[in-house]
Each structure stands twice: as C-alpha cells, then as structure tokens.
Curated annotation (Swiss-Prot):
Catalytic activity: an N-acylsphing-4-enine + a 1,2-diacyl-sn-glycero-3-phosphocholine = a sphingomyelin + a 1,2-diacyl-sn-glycerol; 1-(9Z-octadecenoyl)-2-acyl-sn-3-glycerol + a sphingomyelin = a 1-(9Z-octadecenoyl)-2-acyl-sn-glycero-3-phosphocholine + an N-acylsphing-4-enine; N-hexadecanoylsphinganine + a 1,2-diacyl-sn-glycero-3-phosphocholine = N-hexadecanoyl-sphinganine-1-phosphocholine + a 1,2-diacyl-sn-glycerol; N-hexadecanoyl-(4R)-hydroxysphinganine + a 1,2-diacyl-sn-glycero-3-phosphocholine = N-hexadecanoyl-(4R)-hydroxysphinganine-phosphocholine + a 1,2-diacyl-sn-glycerol
Name under which the protein is recorded: Phosphatidylcholine:ceramide cholinephosphotransferase 1
GO cellular component terms, A-Z: endoplasmic reticulum; Golgi membrane; Golgi trans cisterna; nucleus; plasma membrane
Record keywords, A-Z: Apoptosis, Golgi apparatus, Kinase, Lipid metabolism, Membrane, Phosphoprotein, Sphingolipid metabolism, Transferase, Transmembrane, Transmembrane helix
Lineage: Eukaryota, Metazoa, Chordata, Craniata, Vertebrata
UniProt record, GO biological process: apoptotic process; cellular response to lipopolysaccharide; cellular response to tumor necrosis factor; ceramide biosynthetic process; negative regulation of extrinsic apoptotic signaling pathway; positive regulation of gene expression; sphingomyelin biosynthetic process
Residue ranges, Cytoplasmic side: 331-419
Source organism per UniProt: Mus musculus (Mouse)
Length: 419
C-alpha cells in the first residue's frame, strides 16, 4: 500500500511513479497509454478521456475501474489534507490572549468556539466495491484439467489403434520428403528433441508456480493442449502414413488382443509418450507431431506470461524450441508435413484463444463475431466469462518460507510486467 505521505504528494508524482501505481493496482494495460502522465494528469482523467485515443481501446469497461481507483486516490488525498489542516478533525483558529505583563500570546481554540467543538460534515464519494477482475475459479480449472487428461488418454488409445493399421516398411516404403533428401539421419537427434522438450516443460512449470493468476492461465493451457491432442486423434486416425524411415522398429501387432493393448497403452501413458523413456515403440502417430505441439506451446506460454524485459529468457526458450523441432526432422522420426501442420495448428489456436480472451466483445456471440462459430466457443465462454481484460503478468512467492534477497529487493506481491 502507498503511504499517507505518498498520497499527499500524488499531484507531484512523476510518470514513473504513476506507472508504479498502475502496476501496484494490477492495471498494467494502462502503462503504455499513460507513460507520459504525471500525478496531476492522472487525477484529472475523466470519462470523456476514455472515449478517444489513446485510452478508448485499452479496457473493455471504458476505464471504469481506473476511474474508481482514481476517486479512491482523491479521497485519501483529501482526507490527509483535511487531517493536516484540522485538530482532531476540527478547524483550529488562533486568537490573541493578553498576558499579565501587557504582551499578547496566541491561543488556539477549536473552530473559534470558546467552550467547545463544532462538528463539520464532509461528504466523501466512496466507490462501490467490485468483485475481482480475475477470479481464480479452481473448479473450472479442474474441469479443464480433466478435459486435457481425457484427450491425452484418447490420443494414447488412438496411437495403439493406428499402430495396428500401419503397413510394414518392406511393403510400403517411406514417402518422399524434401528435408530427408538434403539431410542425412542423425541417430541421437530425437533424444535432443525430447530433452529440450522436458527442459521447456520444467521451465514452464516453475514459472507457473510463481504466477499470481495461475488458475486462469493453467485453465487456458489445459483447454488449448487438450484441443490440440483431440485434433491429433482425428488426423492420425483418418490418414495412416507409412513409417518415415527404414530405421523404425515397430512393436509387433497384437491382432485384437485387447488385454495386451491395454497394457501397452498404460506403458505409453506412464512413460509420458516419450521414446527416451522406452515407452513409445509404436508407429503411425505421424500426422501431426505431438513433440512439435509441446515444444511450440510451452514456448508460447512462457513468452506470453513472463516479463517483456526478460528478453534473454525468451531467446533461450525460443532456441530450445527451434533446435528441438529441427532435431525431430534431423532424426527422420516425422515427415516435414507433420511438423509444419503441428506448428500451424498450435500457433493459430493459441493466438485465436488469447485474442478472444483479451477482447470482451469477442466473448459475446453475434452476427459480426465470426470467431463465435468455432465448435469450442461455448466451453470458451464458460471458462473465460468472468475474466475481465488482459490477465496481468503478476508474480508472487507461493512458498511459506521468505524469499532470499540477493542483490536488490524483489517484491513478489507486485507486478513484474513490462508492457
């Protein structure tokens, strides 16, 4: 909280102080439009200012929340000024009192009244209490998790089903691929891909732990990753491609042995669907690449929900993602079209979802809103209807022990956001 002294000096705030106040009150979207505003400019804002650039498209509530916060700021400023000009809440007036030696001294009397105080009624506008712009709603997050888990299990089942349909490599050789024509296979490349993927997932999990609004963000992650794997179930089932290389040693077909298939599915789930764990030795899950999905999606979430000033962190994660995707092709474990389709679907679904989530008008179905025609629009409305505006990149320390300050003080309760 800002101190009373700081409140008193609000009119003298610099643009940097205004930006700090906006971040402190979870309104980072105003930092860029108001980057040159002083404290005096801030408290002079009116409803009309939000009907013209640069503020008319910043928030879906027409700036009402910011105006309410400014009213609170004015109220606290007024109370501090009133307190400093009055004694115990009442005006004090000095009068001359004669002394025995003929001189005069000044004696203060409350409100100028010789025998008591006169009450003053002050009308202070109080902003109406509002509910949180970013409710946690963990129940919805749990439903999104169940959806993602169901899609992952369904994908695993579908891999086992498709494996039975893959033609032997001796009968149906690999399809021609331009990348394979120019790059020879590197045996260890796929292990590098999976290691990079595990590093990115680990970084994202650690970053997620520090997020203040982790419920909303994880809900979005589960919805997107679940839908991507659901799409993957469809594409791999409708078109079964032959193995991309003669190096593949696919596990034997089971020919209707459902008990053995269940054991194989459980083994694949337990190993996370990774070849490096020895759990994935089935063929047929080519169109499109699940490894590309995770490498791309984890990078997109890491970049979207981390401070802009951590550009070096973004570049490291981007490099891990790009090298991992390149190694998929270098290992000849997926056709190039598998990677291209996976990248395209992942990025478009991520961008569409976040565009719709960040624009209040797109959360309402209408003739003009063509995005409302996607099949997952109703679930999207259910998960996002109570989230107002862009979710801040706000971090906090989630553990019971205090954080150790090394070089400079870091306040985890404040927004670490460079918009």
């Amino acid at each position: 909280m800002l101190s009373a002294r700081t409140m008193k000096e609000v009119v003298y705030w610099s643009p940097k102080k205004v930006a700090d106040w906006l971040l402190e009150n979870a309104m980072p979207e105003y930092c860029e439009p108001l980057e040159h505003f002083t404290g005096q400019d801030l408290i002079n804002l009116t409803q009309e200012d939000f009907k013209k650039p640069p503020l008319y498209r910043v928030s879906s509530d027409n700036g009402q929340r910011l105006l309410d916060m400014i009213e609170t700021l004015k109220m606290e400023h007024h109370m501090e000024a009133h307190k400093n000009g009055h004694a115990n809440g009442h005006l004090s007036i000095g009068v001359d009192i004669p002394n025995p030696d003929g001189s005069f001294s000044i004696k203060t009397k409350p409100n100028g009244m010789p025998n008591g105080f006169r009450k003053e009624m002050i009308k202070i506008p109080m902003p109406e209490p509002e509910r949180s712009q970013y409710p946690m709603e963990w129940g919805k997050t749990f439903l999104a998790f169940l959806y993602a888990l169901s899609c992952f299990v369904l994908t695993t089942v579908m891999i086992s089903v498709v494996h039975e349909r893959v033609p032997p490599k001796e009968v149906q050789p690999p399809l021609p691929d331009t990348f394979f024509d120019h790059f020879n296979r590197v045996q260890w490349a796929f292990s590098i891909c999976e290691i990079n993927g595990m590093i990115l997932v680990g970084l994202w999990l650690f970053q997620w732990l520090l997020l203040k609004y982790k419920s909303i963000i994880s809900r979005r992650f589960f919805c997107i990753v679940g839908t991507l794997y659901l799409y993957r179930c469809i594409t791999m089932y409708v078109t079964t491609l032959p193995v991309p290389g003669m190096h593949f040693n696919c596990s034997p077909k089971l020919f209707g042995d459902w008990e053995a298939q269940v054991r194989r599915i459980m083994k694949l789930i337990a190993g996370g669907g990774l070849s490096i764990t020895g759990s994935h030795n089935m063929c047929g899950d080519y169109l499109y690449s699940g490894h590309t999905v995770m490498l791309t999606l984890t990078y997109l979430f890491i970049k979207e929900y981390s401070p802009r000033r951590l550009w070096w962190y973004h570049w490291i994660c981007w490099l891990l993602s790009v090298v991992g995707i390149f190694c998929i092709l270098l290992a000849h474990d997926h056709y190039t079209v598998d990677v291209v389709v996976a990248y395209y679907i992942t990025t478009r679904l991520f961008w569409w979802y976040h565009t719709m989530a960040n624009q209040q008008v797109l959360k309402e179905a209408s003739q003009m809103n063509l995005l409302a025609r996607v099949w997952w629009y109703r679930p999207f409305q259910y998960f996002e209807k109570n989230v107002q505006g862009i979710v801040p990149r706000s971090y906090h320390w989630p553990f019971p022990w205090p954080v150790v300050h090394l070089s400079r003080q870091v306040k985890y309760s404040r927004l670490v956001n460079d918009t």
